[in-house]
Amino acid sequence: MTVSLSNLSNLSDLARKRVAVAAYYFVPGVVFASWASRIPDVKQMLHLSNGQLGTVLFAIPIGQLLMMAFSGILVSRFGSKKMLVLSELLYALVLFCIGSSTTVFHLILSLIAFGMMANLMNIATNTQACLVEKMYGRNIMSSFHGLWSLGGFSGGIIGAIFANTLLPIDVHFGTILALSILIVAVGFRFLINDAMAKAEEEDVPKFSFKTIDPILFLLGLMGFAGMFCEGTVYDWSSVYFSSVVKPDEAFIRAGYVAGMGAMTLGRFMADGFVTKYGPARVLKVCGGLILGGLWLAAALPYLIPAT
């Protein structure tokens, strides 16, 4: 009986850790979608042309690139738990700064900081997820990424509601900031202590370009192409709907919300599909679906096919 209670206690503790990490994936999904769903409003507020908006949107990847060299160092030095909490809080705070931008310069600075916090948060969150997955002893990573997409889907719907009620962007983003602080504060104590995890780590071989299989560069190129398509949906779907598809105001964000909903389903089903059909076949089918979806949206710029 004692053993059974002990096992139950361990299982319950592990489940709490998984839920906490899942919540830390969900929050940035909501935060990012809040920004992405209001891009047309920010564009209109600052009187930006499509060309100017495209230039401004480069600020996020610039911030990610600037932080890339430091994120791993910070997580290793201070632990993923501390860096995750810090980056998620700052990520939501920067979102509020984006909504409060009154000049293009202010917006660009905010978006650079947004990208920097996103990169640090990605490293810290995935580190926590890897630790939980190791404890479970089976592949659960896609479910965490699915929670990010679910957050994006939810954030897109929330953004559409705020936009359709004509509430100011700073009120919308301020509400998301408050909710983010609440969730981060509740989940903090259930995150994994890195010091405890590091004590169990084995020696890891040092990185060397000589040991890299050339096929990894091809996979990296494929990943880049996938992220390029993904970024197009994130940054331009709402603008495309508002300027080309031109549906009723209530449906301007329909494309973004539909894309995030489909991504959520795909990520939750990914582990099962890969196990059943193999990664190569799934990759080919997904590539074809991406190509077909983008072509359909561009060739038939109407509400139903574009969505």
Tell where the protein language model's regions lie, with residue ranges.
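Short amphipathic helix-loop junctions that connect adjacent transmembrane helices
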Residues: 37-51, 235-251
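Residue-level signature of mid-helix packing/kink "hotspots" within the transmembrane helices
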Residues: 33, 60-69, 152-153, 260-268
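Helix-breaking motifs and short loop linkers at transmembrane-helix boundaries and internal kinks
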Residues: 47, 79, 100-105, 246, ...
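Helix-loop-helix hairpin linking two adjacent transmembrane segments in secondary transporters
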Residues: 106, 143-192
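Cytoplasmic helix-loop-helix junction between adjacent transmembrane helices
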Residues: 111-147
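Structural signature of the two symmetry-related core transmembrane helices
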Residues: 82-96, 281-296
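Conserved MFS/SLC helix-loop-helix module at the cytosolic interface between two early adjacent transmembrane helices
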Residues: 66-105
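Helix-to-loop junctions at the C-terminal end of transmembrane segments
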Residues: 67-80, 163, 266-279
